[in-house]
Design a protein with these regions (language model features):
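Structural marker of alpha-solenoid helical repeat scaffolds
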Residues: 27, 57-61, 90
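Non-heme Fe(II)/2-oxoglutarate
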Residues: 110-204
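Catalytic core of non-heme Fe(II) oxygenases with the double-stranded beta-helix
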Residues: 175-179, 183-186, 190-285, 295-296, ...
Length: 314
Protein backbone atom coordinates (compact mmCIF):
# COMPACT_ATOMS: atom_id res chain seq x y z
CA UNK A 1 0.00 0.00 0.00
CA UNK A 2 2.85 2.39 0.84
CA UNK A 3 4.52 1.80 -2.53
CA UNK A 4 1.23 2.34 -4.39
CA UNK A 5 0.71 5.54 -2.42
CA UNK A 6 4.15 6.76 -3.48
CA UNK A 7 3.41 5.97 -7.13
CA UNK A 8 0.22 8.05 -7.07
CA UNK A 9 1.93 10.84 -5.10
CA UNK A 10 4.63 11.07 -7.78
CA UNK A 11 1.89 11.09 -10.44
CA UNK A 12 0.22 13.97 -8.54
CA UNK A 13 -2.94 11.90 -8.14
CA UNK A 14 -3.32 12.93 -4.53
CA UNK A 15 -6.75 11.49 -3.69
CA UNK A 16 -5.66 8.04 -4.86
CA UNK A 17 -2.40 8.40 -2.92
CA UNK A 18 -4.31 9.34 0.25
CA UNK A 19 -6.42 6.18 -0.07
CA UNK A 20 -3.39 3.90 -0.25
CA UNK A 21 -1.44 5.74 2.47
CA UNK A 22 -4.41 5.37 4.82
CA UNK A 23 -4.62 1.67 4.00
CA UNK A 24 -0.93 1.26 4.84
CA UNK A 25 -1.59 2.83 8.26
CA UNK A 26 -4.38 0.32 8.92
CA UNK A 27 -1.73 -2.41 8.70
CA UNK A 28 1.04 -0.52 10.52
CA UNK A 29 0.39 2.70 12.44
CA UNK A 30 4.08 2.96 13.34
CA UNK A 31 4.98 3.92 9.76
CA UNK A 32 5.48 7.56 10.71
CA UNK A 33 6.86 8.43 7.27
CA UNK A 34 3.34 7.81 5.91
CA UNK A 35 2.07 10.77 7.95
CA UNK A 36 4.60 12.96 6.16
CA UNK A 37 3.40 11.80 2.73
CA UNK A 38 -0.23 12.35 3.77
CA UNK A 39 0.79 15.87 4.75
CA UNK A 40 2.26 16.34 1.27
CA UNK A 41 -0.97 15.14 -0.35
CA UNK A 42 -3.21 17.42 1.67
CA UNK A 43 -0.93 20.43 1.18
CA UNK A 44 -1.03 19.87 -2.57
CA UNK A 45 -4.84 19.87 -2.56
CA UNK A 46 -4.77 23.05 -0.44
CA UNK A 47 -6.08 21.49 2.76
CA UNK A 48 -3.26 23.03 4.78
CA UNK A 49 -4.86 22.51 8.21
CA UNK A 50 -5.09 18.78 7.59
CA UNK A 51 -1.59 18.74 6.10
CA UNK A 52 -0.27 20.40 9.27
CA UNK A 53 -1.93 17.79 11.49
CA UNK A 54 -0.17 15.00 9.58
CA UNK A 55 3.21 16.73 9.45
CA UNK A 56 3.09 17.08 13.24
CA UNK A 57 2.64 13.29 13.53
CA UNK A 58 5.50 12.51 11.16
CA UNK A 59 9.20 11.88 11.72
CA UNK A 60 10.93 12.95 8.52
CA UNK A 61 14.01 15.03 7.71
CA UNK A 62 11.71 17.72 6.30
CA UNK A 63 9.09 17.59 9.09
CA UNK A 64 9.93 20.87 10.83
CA UNK A 65 10.43 22.86 7.63
CA UNK A 66 6.99 21.68 6.47
CA UNK A 67 5.35 22.63 9.78
CA UNK A 68 6.93 26.09 9.58
CA UNK A 69 5.68 26.44 6.00
CA UNK A 70 2.13 25.55 7.09
CA UNK A 71 2.23 28.12 9.89
CA UNK A 72 3.30 30.68 7.29
CA UNK A 73 0.53 29.73 4.83
CA UNK A 74 -2.06 29.83 7.63
CA UNK A 75 -0.65 33.16 8.85
CA UNK A 76 0.04 31.75 12.33
CA UNK A 77 2.93 34.09 13.08
CA UNK A 78 3.07 33.45 16.85
CA UNK A 79 3.15 29.68 16.40
CA UNK A 80 5.86 30.10 13.76
CA UNK A 81 7.93 32.29 16.10
CA UNK A 82 7.55 29.86 19.00
CA UNK A 83 8.64 26.87 16.92
CA UNK A 84 11.56 28.60 15.19
CA UNK A 85 12.80 29.76 18.61
CA UNK A 86 12.76 26.17 19.85
CA UNK A 87 14.45 24.77 16.72
CA UNK A 88 17.13 27.48 16.93
CA UNK A 89 18.27 26.00 20.24
CA UNK A 90 17.86 22.31 19.40
CA UNK A 91 19.02 22.21 15.76
CA UNK A 92 20.93 25.42 14.92
CA UNK A 93 22.56 24.37 11.63
CA UNK A 94 19.77 22.66 9.66
CA UNK A 95 20.05 24.00 6.11
CA UNK A 96 16.38 23.37 5.27
CA UNK A 97 15.31 25.35 8.33
CA UNK A 98 17.83 28.08 7.47
CA UNK A 99 16.34 28.39 3.98
CA UNK A 100 12.71 28.64 5.02
CA UNK A 101 13.39 30.88 8.05
CA UNK A 102 15.19 33.42 5.85
CA UNK A 103 12.21 33.49 3.50
CA UNK A 104 9.42 33.55 6.09
CA UNK A 105 11.20 36.23 8.14
CA UNK A 106 11.22 38.43 5.05
CA UNK A 107 7.57 37.71 4.30
CA UNK A 108 6.41 38.26 7.89
CA UNK A 109 8.73 41.31 8.12
CA UNK A 110 10.35 40.02 11.32
CA UNK A 111 13.96 39.47 12.37
CA UNK A 112 15.38 36.12 11.33
CA UNK A 113 16.48 34.53 14.60
CA UNK A 114 17.56 31.18 13.15
CA UNK A 115 21.34 31.27 13.71
CA UNK A 116 22.77 29.37 10.73
CA UNK A 117 22.88 32.21 8.19
CA UNK A 118 20.34 34.97 8.76
CA UNK A 119 21.23 36.99 5.65
CA UNK A 120 22.48 34.43 3.11
CA UNK A 121 22.50 36.82 0.15
CA UNK A 122 25.33 38.70 1.88
CA UNK A 123 27.55 35.62 1.68
CA UNK A 124 27.83 35.19 -2.09
CA UNK A 125 31.38 35.55 -3.36
CA UNK A 126 32.67 35.45 -6.96
CA UNK A 127 36.33 35.23 -7.95
CA UNK A 128 38.13 34.51 -11.20
CA UNK A 129 40.66 31.74 -10.54
CA UNK A 130 42.45 31.75 -13.90
CA UNK A 131 45.76 32.83 -12.32
CA UNK A 132 45.44 30.15 -9.63
CA UNK A 133 44.98 27.54 -12.33
CA UNK A 134 47.88 28.86 -14.40
CA UNK A 135 50.13 28.74 -11.32
CA UNK A 136 49.22 25.05 -10.95
CA UNK A 137 49.63 24.37 -14.70
CA UNK A 138 45.94 23.50 -14.91
CA UNK A 139 44.08 24.08 -18.17
CA UNK A 140 40.29 24.34 -18.59
CA UNK A 141 40.45 21.85 -21.48
CA UNK A 142 42.28 19.39 -19.24
CA UNK A 143 39.39 19.53 -16.76
CA UNK A 144 36.78 19.18 -19.50
CA UNK A 145 38.51 16.13 -20.99
CA UNK A 146 38.98 14.49 -17.60
CA UNK A 147 35.39 14.98 -16.50
CA UNK A 148 33.75 13.96 -19.78
CA UNK A 149 35.29 10.50 -19.42
CA UNK A 150 32.59 10.02 -16.79
CA UNK A 151 29.14 9.06 -18.08
CA UNK A 152 26.71 12.00 -18.09
CA UNK A 153 23.01 11.24 -17.59
CA UNK A 154 20.34 13.33 -19.35
CA UNK A 155 17.73 14.92 -17.04
CA UNK A 156 18.34 12.46 -14.22
CA UNK A 157 15.09 11.72 -12.33
CA UNK A 158 14.80 13.47 -8.98
CA UNK A 159 17.45 16.07 -9.81
CA UNK A 160 17.07 19.74 -10.78
CA UNK A 161 18.51 19.68 -14.31
CA UNK A 162 16.15 20.34 -17.24
CA UNK A 163 17.53 20.33 -20.78
CA UNK A 164 20.93 19.11 -19.73
CA UNK A 165 22.98 16.25 -18.34
CA UNK A 166 24.91 15.59 -15.15
CA UNK A 167 27.72 13.41 -13.86
CA UNK A 168 27.82 12.76 -10.12
CA UNK A 169 30.36 11.48 -7.57
CA UNK A 170 33.38 12.86 -9.40
CA UNK A 171 35.38 12.70 -6.16
CA UNK A 172 35.44 8.91 -6.54
CA UNK A 173 37.39 9.16 -9.80
CA UNK A 174 41.15 9.55 -9.99
CA UNK A 175 41.27 12.58 -12.28
CA UNK A 176 44.57 14.45 -11.97
CA UNK A 177 43.14 17.75 -13.21
CA UNK A 178 40.27 17.53 -10.71
CA UNK A 179 42.72 16.86 -7.87
CA UNK A 180 44.60 20.03 -8.86
CA UNK A 181 41.36 22.00 -8.89
CA UNK A 182 40.39 20.60 -5.51
CA UNK A 183 43.65 21.93 -4.03
CA UNK A 184 42.81 25.38 -5.41
CA UNK A 185 39.31 25.13 -3.93
CA UNK A 186 40.68 24.24 -0.49
CA UNK A 187 42.72 27.46 -0.56
CA UNK A 188 39.83 29.59 -1.82
CA UNK A 189 37.43 28.12 0.75
CA UNK A 190 39.90 29.09 3.47
CA UNK A 191 40.03 32.62 2.02
CA UNK A 192 36.22 32.72 1.94
CA UNK A 193 35.97 31.83 5.61
CA UNK A 194 38.62 34.43 6.48
CA UNK A 195 36.72 37.06 4.48
CA UNK A 196 33.61 36.58 6.64
CA UNK A 197 35.34 35.72 9.94
CA UNK A 198 33.65 38.54 11.88
CA UNK A 199 30.12 37.52 10.92
CA UNK A 200 28.13 36.31 13.91
CA UNK A 201 26.32 33.28 12.53
CA UNK A 202 26.66 29.51 12.89
CA UNK A 203 27.65 29.21 9.23
CA UNK A 204 30.92 31.04 9.96
CA UNK A 205 31.47 30.63 13.70
CA UNK A 206 30.90 26.84 13.62
CA UNK A 207 32.81 26.41 10.36
CA UNK A 208 33.83 22.77 9.73
CA UNK A 209 37.21 21.84 11.20
CA UNK A 210 37.22 18.92 8.78
CA UNK A 211 35.14 18.48 5.66
CA UNK A 212 34.86 16.37 2.54
CA UNK A 213 34.00 17.37 -1.02
CA UNK A 214 31.01 16.23 -3.02
CA UNK A 215 31.76 17.16 -6.65
CA UNK A 216 29.66 16.80 -9.79
CA UNK A 217 29.33 18.41 -13.21
CA UNK A 218 26.42 19.85 -15.20
CA UNK A 219 26.22 20.46 -18.93
CA UNK A 220 23.26 22.55 -20.14
CA UNK A 221 22.15 22.79 -23.76
CA UNK A 222 20.18 25.66 -25.33
CA UNK A 223 17.11 26.52 -23.19
CA UNK A 224 18.33 24.18 -20.46
CA UNK A 225 18.30 25.20 -16.80
CA UNK A 226 18.38 24.06 -13.19
CA UNK A 227 15.26 24.57 -11.10
CA UNK A 228 15.42 26.41 -7.77
CA UNK A 229 16.95 24.34 -4.98
CA UNK A 230 19.27 24.26 -1.98
CA UNK A 231 21.93 21.72 -0.98
CA UNK A 232 20.70 20.53 2.45
CA UNK A 233 23.62 18.15 3.01
CA UNK A 234 26.23 20.80 2.24
CA UNK A 235 27.70 23.58 4.35
CA UNK A 236 29.23 25.72 1.63
CA UNK A 237 28.39 25.26 -2.06
CA UNK A 238 30.06 26.50 -5.19
CA UNK A 239 30.71 26.22 -8.88
CA UNK A 240 33.62 26.61 -11.29
CA UNK A 241 32.64 27.55 -14.83
CA UNK A 242 34.32 25.73 -17.73
CA UNK A 243 32.12 26.76 -20.67
CA UNK A 244 29.77 29.74 -21.04
CA UNK A 245 27.68 30.21 -24.23
CA UNK A 246 28.60 33.09 -26.52
CA UNK A 247 26.14 35.69 -27.84
CA UNK A 248 23.85 35.45 -24.83
CA UNK A 249 21.50 38.26 -23.80
CA UNK A 250 21.26 40.01 -20.43
CA UNK A 251 21.19 37.41 -17.64
CA UNK A 252 20.97 34.31 -19.84
CA UNK A 253 23.02 31.36 -18.51
CA UNK A 254 23.34 33.20 -15.21
CA UNK A 255 22.76 31.90 -11.70
CA UNK A 256 20.00 33.57 -9.68
CA UNK A 257 20.06 33.52 -5.89
CA UNK A 258 16.88 34.20 -3.94
CA UNK A 259 15.26 33.78 -0.53
CA UNK A 260 12.31 32.18 -2.34
CA UNK A 261 12.12 28.55 -3.39
CA UNK A 262 10.13 25.30 -3.02
CA UNK A 263 7.09 27.06 -4.55
CA UNK A 264 6.47 28.80 -1.22
CA UNK A 265 3.44 31.10 -1.41
CA UNK A 266 4.33 34.75 -1.92
CA UNK A 267 2.70 37.40 0.30
CA UNK A 268 5.22 40.21 -0.24
CA UNK A 269 6.27 40.31 -3.90
CA UNK A 270 9.46 42.33 -3.54
CA UNK A 271 11.73 39.36 -2.80
CA UNK A 272 15.49 40.09 -2.80
CA UNK A 273 17.46 38.30 -5.52
CA UNK A 274 21.02 38.47 -6.82
CA UNK A 275 21.96 37.33 -10.32
CA UNK A 276 25.49 36.55 -11.45
CA UNK A 277 26.37 35.88 -15.09
CA UNK A 278 29.63 33.96 -14.73
CA UNK A 279 32.59 33.91 -17.08
CA UNK A 280 34.91 31.02 -17.81
CA UNK A 281 37.33 30.51 -14.86
CA UNK A 282 34.88 32.11 -12.39
CA UNK A 283 34.41 30.51 -8.99
CA UNK A 284 31.16 31.31 -7.17
CA UNK A 285 30.75 30.40 -3.47
CA UNK A 286 27.61 30.64 -1.32
CA UNK A 287 25.90 29.09 1.74
CA UNK A 288 24.32 25.72 0.97
CA UNK A 289 21.05 26.98 2.50
CA UNK A 290 20.56 29.64 -0.19
CA UNK A 291 18.05 28.95 -2.97
CA UNK A 292 19.52 29.21 -6.45
CA UNK A 293 18.59 28.36 -10.02
CA UNK A 294 20.02 28.87 -13.50
CA UNK A 295 18.53 31.08 -16.19
CA UNK A 296 17.81 29.47 -19.60
CA UNK A 297 19.75 30.64 -22.64
CA UNK A 298 19.52 30.36 -26.42
CA UNK A 299 22.79 29.37 -28.05
CA UNK A 300 24.39 26.55 -30.00
CA UNK A 301 27.08 26.50 -27.28
CA UNK A 302 26.99 24.55 -24.03
CA UNK A 303 27.14 25.81 -20.46
CA UNK A 304 29.43 23.53 -18.45
CA UNK A 305 30.43 23.77 -14.83
CA UNK A 306 31.88 21.82 -11.94
CA UNK A 307 29.63 22.08 -8.89
CA UNK A 308 30.52 21.10 -5.34
CA UNK A 309 29.51 21.10 -1.71
CA UNK A 310 31.66 20.73 1.34
CA UNK A 311 30.15 18.36 3.88
CA UNK A 312 31.01 18.89 7.53
CA UNK A 313 32.85 15.98 9.15
CA UNK A 314 33.91 17.69 12.38
Amino acid sequence: YLNLGMVYLNLRKYQEAIKFFNQSLVHNKKLTSVYYYLGECYKNINDVDKALSYYILSHHQKTYSKILECYFILNKKKKYQKLISSISKDDPDNRRIAAISAYISHQFNIRNIYPFCQNPLNFILKKNIKKNMENDSLEIQELIEGITKKKFTWELFGKTTVGGSSAYNLTQLEITSLSKLQNILVSEISNYKENFKNENCTFIQKWPKKYKFNIWSNILKSEGYNTSHIHPAGWLSGGVYLKIPSNIKKNEAGIEFSLHGENYPIKIKNIPTITIVPKVYDLVLFPSSLFHKTIPFKSSDERMMIAFDIHKLQ
